[in-house]
């Protein structure tokens, strides 16, 4: 009799354990179904996003073609203008050499002048010109320092956004690992759903890789358009500059301005790339 009671208790305990496992399996099955639905929604969104990216790539291809045609015309115009500028520069060089010789003769004549007051006035005017130029150079340097600080601030902000995205990605990966561990404990009823979930995940990864490929092509087209646009602007500026007046050629100032403009474009491009990366990773 005692053995029968023990047997009944064991059967009752097995029944309770079986019920617990059944409830746990049902809960995990529900979670797997919800996860499958979520991934299906993400898959549909990714397909829609890929369609938009393909349309946008077509648009960038047309824009790239137009920019290349404009660049060819501008480069031809710039080449003609540069040839004229080279000729004018040779003439300017001859004039400058003659001017140097004349200035040397003038300096020799001035040294022989007996009127010290006139020489002092000339020296004073020369000092004022030098002081004015030095003041302008200092103002320009201050402006460049301010612009450089702004560029550094943009780069620091971009680094901060990148670190924030990296932290979010680590959290998401941790959540995904825990979810996969719980899904592995499900009973045979959720096994088929897990297989379907794996297939959907593989499709999603494939689409993500495809999207990354399109994004890279998009970035490449954007960079090429940007480079061609910059070259077009530079060629047009050089042509207009040469046609307008050779006397306005101030090589040192132009080099500094071009270098500063390139740095601003560089930091702006870095900020935009990191913003795109942040948006893409957040949407994923």
From Swiss-Prot:
GO terms for cellular component: actin filament; cytoplasm. GO terms for biological process: actin filament organization; muscle contraction. One of its GO terms (molecular function) is actin filament binding. It comes from Sus scrofa. The modification Phosphotyrosine is found at residue 261. This is Tropomyosin alpha-3 chain. The gene is TPM3. The modification Phosphothreonine is found at residues 53, 108, 252, 282. The modification N-acetylmethionine is found at residue 1. Keywords: Acetylation, Actin-binding, Coiled coil, Cytoplasm, Cytoskeleton, Muscle protein, Phosphoprotein. The modification Phosphoserine is found at residues 61, 87, 271, 283. Residues 1-284 form a coiled coil. Binds to actin filaments in muscle and non-muscle cells. Plays a central role, in association with the troponin complex, in the calcium dependent regulation of vertebrate striated muscle contraction. Smooth muscle contraction is regulated by interaction with caldesmon. In non-muscle cells is implicated in stabilizing cytoskeleton actin filaments. Belongs to the tropomyosin family. The keyword Glycosyltransferase does not apply. It is found in: Cytoplasm, Cytoskeleton. InterPro entries: Tropomyosin. Residues 1-40 are annotated as: Disordered. The keyword Lipid biosynthesis does not apply. PANTHER family: TROPOMYOSIN.
């Amino acid at each position: 009799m005692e053995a029968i009671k023990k047997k009944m208790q064991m059967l009752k305990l097995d029944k309770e354990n079986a019920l617990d496992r059944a409830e746990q399996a049902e809960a995990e099955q529900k979670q797997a179904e919800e996860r499958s639905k979520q991934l299906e929604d993400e898959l549909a969104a990714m397909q829609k996003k890929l369609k938009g990216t393909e349309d946008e790539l077509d648009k960038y291809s047309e824009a790239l073609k137009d920019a290349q045609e404009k660049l060819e015309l501008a480069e031809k115009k710039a080449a003609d203008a540069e040839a004229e500028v080279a000729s004018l520069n040779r003439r300017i060089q001859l004039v400058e050499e003659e001017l140097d010789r004349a200035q040397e003769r003038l300096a020799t004549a001035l040294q022989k002048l007996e009127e010290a007051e006139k020489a002092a006035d000339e020296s004073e005017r020369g000092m004022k010109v030098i002081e004015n130029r030095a003041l302008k150079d200092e103002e320009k340097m201050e402006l460049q320092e301010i612009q450089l600080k702004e560029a550094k601030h943009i780069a620091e902000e971009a680094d901060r956004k990148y670190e924030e995205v990296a932290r979010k990605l680590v959290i998401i990966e941790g959540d995904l690992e825990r979810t996969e561990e719980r899904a592995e404990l499900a009973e045979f009823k959720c096994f088929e759903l897990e297989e379907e979930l794996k297939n959907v995940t593989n499709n999603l990864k494939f689409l993500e890789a495809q999207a990354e490929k399109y994004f890279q092509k998009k970035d490449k087209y954007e960079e090429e358009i940007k480079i061609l646009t910059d070259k077009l602007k530079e060629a047009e500026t050089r042509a207009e500059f040469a046609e307008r007046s050779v006397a306005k050629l101030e090589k040192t100032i132009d080099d500094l301005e071009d270098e500063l403009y390139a740095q601003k474009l560089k930091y702006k491009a870095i900020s935009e790339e990191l913003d795109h990366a942040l948006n893409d990773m957040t949407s994923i």
